[in-house]
Design a protein with these regions (language model features):
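Active-site-lining helix/loop region of Rossmann-like oxidoreductase modules
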Residues: 114-179
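Solvent-exposed alpha-helices and their adjacent loops that cap or buttress functional pockets
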Residues: 5-7, 34-36, 85, 111-116, ...
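Generic structural signal for well-ordered, non-membrane alpha-helical segments
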Residues: 7-8, 26, 49, 74, ...
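Hydrophobic alpha-helix position signal
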Residues: 2-4, 59, 85, 135, ...
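N-terminal glycine-/serine-/threonine-rich beta1-alpha1-beta2 phosphate-ribose binding loop
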Residues: 1-64
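General beta-strand structural signal in soluble alpha/beta enzymes
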Residues: 26-27, 44, 67-69, 92-96, ...
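Residue-level detector of anion-binding/catalytic polar loops
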Residues: 65, 91, 155
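Rossmann-fold NAD(P)-binding glycine/threonine-rich loop
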Residues: 52-62, 71-111
Length: 179
């Protein structure tokens, strides 16, 4: 409702897991979304490589612009998905996949247009940074710092992507691909 009222965006469908409760916009069938001629943009907020990669690919092939926050699917399939988007003349937007609330991807694209990027430095994972800070400054052990990060909402209930380095690896692949 906020998107419709404040931005003029009409939400047409919400894809849900099979068997989950739903409302009037809910569908279990992705084909219903990409075959709707009123849908111009598909927004992907799934986690993991599949089925997100397939959905992004199918949406682009169906002539829909795509916005995704899914760094795993994008990092694993960057060239393929960007290639389809370029071939179809469609935007594939992924600012939300890296940098949280800062416009990292857009600024990286701008910098790459005017200069050769030879290195990048920064904090790529807030959860890991929080844990390391707690361990360094307060002498906490890893598990204690992780539990605090989870209690504060900085770490997911399943922090595997953060503490296993997968989140950083995906952001690094995307950033390097853009640069």
């Amino acid at each position: 409702q906020l998107a419709e009222r404040d931005c003029g965006i009409e939400l047409r469908h919400i894809l849900r897991r099979p068997g989950k409760a739903g409302g009037p916009l809910m569908t279990e069938h992705f084909a219903e979304i990409i075959n709707d001629p009123e849908v111009d943009v598909v927004v992907d907020v799934l986690a993991g490589i599949e089925p997100s990669r397939t959905y992004i690919r199918e949406a682009l092939l169906a002539g829909k612009a795509v916005v995704t926050a899914n760094k795993a699917a994008l990092a694993a399939n960057y060239e393929e998905l960007l290639g389809i988007a370029h071939a179809k003349g469609l935007p594939l937007l992924f600012e939300a996949s890296c940098g949280g609330g800062i416009p990292w991807i857009e600024n990286l694209k701008k910098a790459a247009r005017i200069d050769r990027i030879e290195s990048m430095h920064g904090i790529l994972n807030g959860t890991g940074n929080f844990i390391l800070d707690r361990m360094d400054r307060f002498g906490m052990d890893f598990d204690e710092a992780l539990k605090e990060a989870q209690a504060l909402g900085y770490a997911e209930a399943d922090p595997t992507a953060d503490i296993g380095g997968f989140d950083v690896a995906n952001k690094a692949v995307i950033s390097a691909s853009v640069a």
